[in-house]
Amino acid sequence: MATLSYAQSTDHWLKRKVVNLVELATGREKITSIYQQLKDEPFQVHQFFSRGIQLSRLSLRYNQEMEARIPRDGPLVFVANHPFGIIDGLILCEIAARIRGDFRILLNNRLMKDENLNKLFLPVDFDGTREATRKNVETKKTAQQILENGGTIIIFPS
């Protein structure tokens, strides 16, 4: 199973240590446990996110009138603002899957560690290299095309 971490083997050892400590302090073990349970089940993209919420023992309370106002077609962008870490992204993915069906997720390329989920991802590379810039331009073009075709994108700015 892929390690769920922003730390990369190419990072300076001190950065890896700090990132790992912060992740451990903010619940990486629990998230990893839930992720492992999800990976043990047959993969279905639309079930993955709702099942993740269920395994997290989250109880979602929201204004159903506001949810009803989310457009069912045409271009749409959801933005996760991260007050609760990965949880807000999980919830937005569940909402997008339920209401819109197909969607793509714009996120840090360091999170691209799951071959089943990678097909949903539009990676952003923060390495600052020419190759990163080239990849980011390609991601931007893909995102624009998705929106021009009336698709849905979730921005996961981590």
Give names to the regions the model predicted:
Residues 74-82, 142-158:
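Conserved Motif II region of HX4D acyltransferases
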Residues 61-63, 79, 106, 123:
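Residues in well-ordered beta-strands of folded domains
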Residues 86:
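Loop/helix-junction capping segments adjacent to catalytic residues or to phosphate/diphosphate-binding pockets
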Residues 80-83, 93-110:
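Adenosine ribonucleotide-centric catalytic and binding domains
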Residues 53-58, 82, 129-134:
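Short, flexible loop segments at the rims of nucleotide/cofactor-binding pockets, characterized by
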Residues 1-76, 89-91, 98-100, 118-119:
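Membrane-anchoring hydrophobic helices of lipid-metabolizing enzymes
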Residues 104-136, 140-143, 147:
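Conserved nucleotide-cofactor-binding alpha/beta core module
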